[in-house]
Amino acid sequence: LDVGCGGGQLIEDIAKSVGIAGKAIGIDPSSSQISSAKELCSGLENTLFICCLANNIDLESESVDAVASIQTFEYIDDIDEALTEIKRLLKPRAKFLNISTLWDYYRFHGPEKKLNDLMHDVFKEHCSHQMVPTFLNGRLKNLGFKDIKTTELAYVFTKRDENSFAKYAETLIANFALSKGVEKDKVSEWQKQIKK
């Protein structure tokens, strides 16, 4: 089960990995994302997509072997409700994998600190929880999850080209800032500065 499956890229890989004897299930609250996922996986017979929130998944208790959540819990208002639902769905000794970003540490560093801070502070509004990895283990323990392990994955981008994640993130942040009312000239200046 992929919680917050988006366009279905991970479900496609899971479905191919588990083969026809298994099933890859994706959930997402966005009907347009579910439509995209269904289209991407249309040639696979072992997929199921459900448009729903993570706290109310229409599946039987103890029915899934593993749950993945990639960059999802940042956007869930009530994390405990979603974790309780995931725990309900997991078979005994099944695995839950979560990957989350420490968004408060995710930033670009151009020469003008005030402008960088403005863009960083505005982008904080893009999700409900900026620092999921700092508290998730405690929540999991309180809800009865066992064998909790954390692996830190640090990454630093040293090159920025048109095909890099840094360029994608810059565009995402710029568009978000514009949607929140930051003046276009400030956003353009920020983009110009971080290109240097």
Language model: regions and residue ranges:
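A short acidic, Gly/Pro-enriched loop at the edge of an enzyme's catalytic core
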Residues: N55-A66
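Class I SAM-dependent methyltransferase SAM/SAH-binding core
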Residues: L1, G7-N56
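C-terminal lobe and adjacent flexible extensions of AdoMet/dcAdoMet transferase-like proteins
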Residues: L143, A166-K196
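Short glycine-dipeptide loop
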Residues: I20-A21, L90-K95
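A short glycine-rich, Lys/Arg-flanked "PGG" loop and its adjoining helix->strand segment in the class I
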Residues: D80-P92
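Conserved catalytic/acceptor-binding region of the Class I
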Residues: L97-E162, F176-S179
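A short SAM/SAH-binding and catalytic strip from SAM-dependent methyltransferases
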Residues: D65-D78
